[in-house]
């Protein structure tokens, strides 16, 4: 075991997979000599050379399109988009080509590639460096979507994503890149895509989150415990496919659920989860599902902390559910 930040865990995952499998290549803006804007790919160019670690032009469409071509010809590319906000010039390639290659080729071709994206707010980056666009991806059939919150999960799920036979959008909470450290195994391991993590057991209320907001979700659960409320905490980790069984079992047990995300509220991913809970567990709910999200505005520069879900907002939502 070694104490790692998320950046270090991601770097270790890439290094191990490149050493293990010569088909794994890395491409993106500044991923080579500079090691990526957040240094996730630091040292890989020096170790594996320019044929496997490739700096690209500033063109997300080219990055995603090139990754698809590489994947179709037998490689396992890991493409980096500097910020999730920048994916939209490459959105057509991702949605129209990458996500649909297996389907439209009748299974003759697959797209075993990963598109890594630093996502979410909390770094005062404004509307071009703070968005959480996961709803766009989970709405696209053919993509798997991962959103990690810990170094341990980051390493295990990135390795699983690289080995997956289908395209994976891998969302990394930039706010947690270096603010969270934990012991991470140095040996090889993977975590299953599609399985949530039970962070805390409880019986009165279920709190569900993923990615950027998990520290606040866990802090809210701790505050509720001081008030005698037993809150169960689920970290979804994977948004597509999300862990239906874990969510339904937890909410059926507690009867109350608060869903937390830093994405805008309208048509958010947690709205889909809330709707599914309401449809399938209506007769077991003691209160309606309650969402705590970002706001339906462009991401602000000056009010970054007010945009993100706070512990206070989560506690207020929990009180509503408990008092219903």
From Swiss-Prot:
Q: What does this protein do?
A: The branched-chain alpha-keto dehydrogenase complex catalyzes the overall conversion of alpha-keto acids to acyl-CoA and CO(2). It contains multiple copies of three enzymatic components: branched-chain alpha-keto acid decarboxylase (E1), lipoamide acyltransferase (E2) and lipoamide dehydrogenase (E3).
Alphabetized UniProt keyword annotations: Oxidoreductase, Thiamine pyrophosphate
Active-site residues are: 129 (proton acceptor)
Reaction catalysis annotation: N(6)-[(R)-lipoyl]-L-lysyl-[protein] + 3-methyl-2-oxobutanoate + H(+) = N(6)-[(R)-S(8)-2-methylpropanoyldihydrolipoyl]-L-lysyl-[protein] + CO2
- EC number(s) on file: 1.2.4.4
Matches recorded under CDD domains? TPP_PYR_E1-PDHc-beta_like
Cofactor(s) the record lists: thiamine diphosphate
> What EC class does the entry list?
oxidoreductase
A molecular-function term among this protein's GO annotations: 3-methyl-2-oxobutanoate dehydrogenase (2-methylpropanoyl-transferring) activity
The region annotated as signal peptide is none
Q: Which InterPro entries match?
A: THDP-binding, Transketo_C/PFOR_II, Transketolase-like_Pyr-bd, Transketolase_C
What quaternary arrangement does the UniProt entry report?
Answer: Heterotetramer of two alpha and two beta chains. Directly associated with ODBA in the E1 complex.
Please verify whether the record's keywords include Phosphoprotein.
no
The protein here is known as 2-oxoisovalerate dehydrogenase subunit beta
Q: Which organism is it from?
A: Thermus thermophilus (strain ATCC 27634 / DSM 579 / HB8)
Q: Does the keyword Membrane apply?
A: no
Binding residues for thiamine diphosphate: 29, 58-60, 82, 86-89
Q: Which Gene3D superfamilies match?
A: 3.40.50.920, 3.40.50.970
Residues where substrate binds: 83-86, 129
Q: What is the lineage of its organism?
A: Bacteria, Thermotogati, Deinococcota, Deinococci, Thermales
């Amino acid at each position: 075991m070694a104490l790692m930040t998320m950046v270090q865990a991601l770097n270790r995952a890439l290094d191990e997979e490149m050493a293990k499998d010569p088909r794994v290549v890395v491409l993106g803006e500044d991923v080579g000599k500079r090691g990526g804007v957040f240094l996730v790919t630091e040292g890989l160019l020096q170790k594996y050379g320019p044929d496997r670690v490739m700096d690209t032009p500033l063109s997300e469409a080219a990055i995603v399109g090139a990754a698809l071509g590489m994947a179709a010809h037998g490689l396992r590319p890991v493409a980096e988009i500097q910020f999730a906000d920048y994916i939209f010039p490459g959105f057509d390639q991702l949605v129209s080509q990458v996500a649909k290659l297996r389907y439209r080729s009748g299974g003759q071709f697959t797209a075993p590639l990963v598109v890594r994206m630093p996502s979410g707010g909390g770094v005062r980056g404004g509307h071009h460096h703070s968005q959480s666009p996961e709803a766009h991806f989970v709405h696209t059939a053919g993509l798997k979507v991962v959103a990690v919150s810990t170094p341990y999960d980051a390493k295990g799920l990135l390795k699983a994503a690289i080995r997956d036979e289908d395209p994976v959008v891998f969302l990394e909470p930039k706010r947690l890149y270096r603010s969270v450290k934990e012991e991470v195994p140095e040996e090889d391991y993977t975590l299953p895509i599609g399985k949530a993590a039970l962070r805390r057991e409880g019986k009165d209320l279920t709190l569900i989150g993923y990615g950027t907001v998990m520290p606040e979700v866990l802090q809210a659960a701790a505050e509720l415990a001081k008030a005698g409320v037993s809150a169960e905490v689920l970290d979804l980790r994977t948004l597509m496919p999300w862990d239906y069984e874990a969510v339904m079992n937890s909410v059926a047990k507690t009867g109350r659920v608060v869903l937390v995300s830093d994405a805008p509220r309208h048509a958010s991913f947690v709205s889909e989860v809330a709707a599914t809970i309401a449809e399938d567990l209506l007769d077991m709910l003691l209160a309606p599902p309650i969402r705590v999200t970002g706001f339906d505005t462009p991401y602000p520069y000056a009010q970054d902390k007010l945009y993100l879900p706070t512990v206070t907002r989560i506690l207020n939502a929990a009180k509503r559910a408990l008092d219903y």
